[in-house]
């Protein structure tokens, strides 16, 4: 049976509209089709703690925490993603963090985050320094 993966979405304000919108870069569809063609994936709306019922209903098998938005800049997204992470940890589900998503995992593990300049960070390759010991983040 194909795995079902949820991908979190950033929050943006569309030009000309005074309303926040959940969104996901369009290249995610191509990326997922290339790296995991037999996986069903779905974007996850920012619902805060209500996301727990949503993912339970869809019986998702894991989560990708996507990039966009700084931690702490969107309370609803923060609540959604920490709820998802706690659900994943309770149910031994795999998680993967991209940019902000990796920062979320690092913060949850009480790791160090260093602020970087946007023009140096966005759409650029940058180093990630790992500790020498193994951290089994999602171990049951």
Placement of each model-derived feature along the sequence:
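N-terminal beta1-alpha1 cap of cysteine-dependent amidohydrolase-like domains
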Residues: 1-96, 100, 107, 111-114, ...
């Amino acid at each position: 049976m194909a795995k079902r993966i949820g991908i979190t979405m950033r929050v943006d304000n569309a030009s000309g509209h005074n309303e926040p919108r959940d969104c996901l870069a369009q290249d995610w569809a191509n990326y997922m089709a290339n790296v995991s063609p037999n996986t069903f994936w779905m974007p996850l709306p920012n619902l805060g703690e209500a996301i727990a019922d949503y993912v339970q209903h869809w019986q998702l098998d894991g989560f990708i925490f996507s990039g966009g938005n700084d931690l702490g800049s969107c309370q609803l997204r923060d609540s959604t993603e920490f709820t998802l992470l706690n659900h994943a940890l309770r149910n031994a589900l795999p998680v993967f963090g991209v940019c902000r998503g990796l920062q979320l995992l690092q913060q949850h593990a009480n790791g160090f985050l260093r602020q970087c300049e946007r023009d140096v960070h966005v759409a650029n390759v940058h180093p990630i320094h790992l500790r020498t010991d193994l951290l089994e983040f999602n171990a049951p």
